[in-house]
Amino acid sequence: MSITAERKTALIKEYARGGADTGSPEVQIAILTERIANLTGHFKTHTKDNHSRRGLLKLVSQRRSLLDYLKRKDEARYRALIERLGIRR
């Protein structure tokens, strides 16, 4: 269900703005998107797992907050990130 450390470091390298950048909104949103995708696949087989569904809703809310922040601060980076991740919003 969760993402591996190797996948997380790959996402950090792909979306980082600098060398060891792990805290930028782009990196955080990319990691959250990966976790959301994993949980969505989990619900295809475990439809009654309401405890994990609540966690999914929290992740989606957190990602939405970060996306709103990025849009408020730098709309060009926001649009580029949405394009790269394939999030339609």
From Swiss-Prot:
One of its GO terms (molecular function) is rRNA binding. One of its GO terms (biological process) is translation. One of its GO terms (cellular component) is cytosolic small ribosomal subunit. Keywords: Ribonucleoprotein, Ribosomal protein, RNA-binding, rRNA-binding. Signal peptide: none annotated. PROSITE patterns: RIBOSOMAL_S15. PANTHER family: RIBOSOMAL PROTEIN S15, BACTERIAL AND ORGANELLAR, SMALL RIBOSOMAL SUBUNIT PROTEIN US15M. One of the primary rRNA binding proteins, it binds directly to 16S rRNA where it helps nucleate assembly of the platform of the 30S subunit by binding and bridging several RNA helices of the 16S rRNA. Belongs to the universal ribosomal protein uS15 family. Part of the 30S ribosomal subunit. Forms a bridge to the 50S subunit in the 70S ribosome, contacting the 23S rRNA. HAMAP family: Ribosomal_uS15_B. This is Small ribosomal subunit protein uS15. It comes from Methylobacterium nodulans (strain LMG 21967 / CNCM I-2342 / ORS 2060).
